[in-house]
């Protein structure tokens, strides 16, 4: 690859990154726990039909993460991080509590 081609390719990548939307900024989830006896943890949420793709059922005390005001809540279903298997999903907002307890 010639040097001029490398420079052009680098400039194209830099230009694409400069025009990318900053709305996808990563916010670290605030430590919390599941405060319900059990809580369904779903893969995703659809505004028309609600949550779908049951991943697992969380027990009381499972370590989760959610940052109020930064992570979305749709009709009571909150985007939540499950620190056990380290993945994102949706659970009921009223089952998230004990913030900063661990």
Where is each model-derived feature located?
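Short, functionally important structural connectors and interaction interfaces within domains
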Residues: 9-11, 50, 83
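General "foldedness" signal
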Residues: 15-17, 21-22, 55, 61, ...
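Secreted/processed peptides and extracellular or luminal domains of membrane proteins
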Residues: 42, 101-102
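SH3/SH3-like beta-barrel superfamily modules
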Residues: 58-101
């Amino acid at each position: 690859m010639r040097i001029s081609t490398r420079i052009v390719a680098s400039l194209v990548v830099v230009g694409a990154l400069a025009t990318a939307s900053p709305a996808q900024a990563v916010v670290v989830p605030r430590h919390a726990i599941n405060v319900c006896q059990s809580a369904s943890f779903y893969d995703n949420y659809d505004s028309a039909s609600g949550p779908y793709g049951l991943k697992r059922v969380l027990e009381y005390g499972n370590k989760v993460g959610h940052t109020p005001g930064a992570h979305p809540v749709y009709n009571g279903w909150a985007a939540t991080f499950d620190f056990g298997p380290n993945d994102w999903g949706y659970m009921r907002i009223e089952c998230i509590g004990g913030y900063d307890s661990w």
